[in-house]
Amino acid sequence: MEAITTNGITLRRTVAAAQGDDALRAMGERITGALGPAVTDWSIAHGELTLIVQGSDIVYALTYLRDDPNCAFRCFIDICGVDYPQRARRFDVVYHLLSLRHNMRVRVKVQTDAATPVPSAIPVFPAANWFERETYDLYGILFSGHPDLRRLLTDYGFEGHPLRKDFPLTGFVEVRYDQDEARVVYEPVKLTQEFRNFDFLSPWEGTDYVLPGDEKKSS
């Protein structure tokens, strides 16, 4: 009975997942049909719908997703960035929305580069304000129409954008408190390392070398 019950639960979960994918597929077709060329591609993965939207149409797309009763994605979750240095438009701006009415999530992506701003989503979702500031701070992605596009997490005068793939792991400057000057000071990062003489003939490496003093008398 337990095995049958377990198989029954697994079967029901499989059917539910298939029904969920069918609902997401219907939602994707509905959205792409309504938005037309504003949506360049869409896909379903891990139970979530992903839309690729033209940057210039992001406000239009977000407004439709929020206001259309067949979508009702009114819960704004967050905005984040992703860096793909090998691409000409290296950045993805990713918007995550939730529809409580339809129990669905949608991921909206916009591709851009460091010089091309993305229209701000604040007119549609005011909560996007600080998320756009965070994305600008960490990736250097610009948002046109933002009322106060300043850094949010890094320090004043911070150089670079720390979540870019080409940003050095050590950063450019070291921030520390100088007790002699009684203030915070900024200094170039110095990774000095004193000379170390490695013993490459160590027996722990499993080599066949014989170190001085380890010779055995021949029998």
Curated annotation (Swiss-Prot):
Family: Belongs to the complex I 30 kDa subunit family.
Disulfide bonds: none
Organism of derivation: Methylorubrum populi (strain ATCC BAA-705 / NCIMB 13946 / BJ001)
Entry protein name: NADH-quinone oxidoreductase subunit C
UniProt gene name: nuoC
Signal peptide (residue range): none
Top EC class for this record: translocase
InterPro entries hit by this protein: NADH_DH_suC, NADH_quin_OxRdtase_su_C/D-like, NADH_UbQ_OxRdtase_30kDa_su, NADH_UbQ_OxRdtase_CS
Phylogenetic classification of the source organism: Bacteria, Pseudomonadati, Pseudomonadota, Alphaproteobacteria, Hyphomicrobiales
Keywords in alphabetical order: Cell inner membrane, Cell membrane, Membrane, NAD, Quinone, Translocase, Transport, Ubiquinone
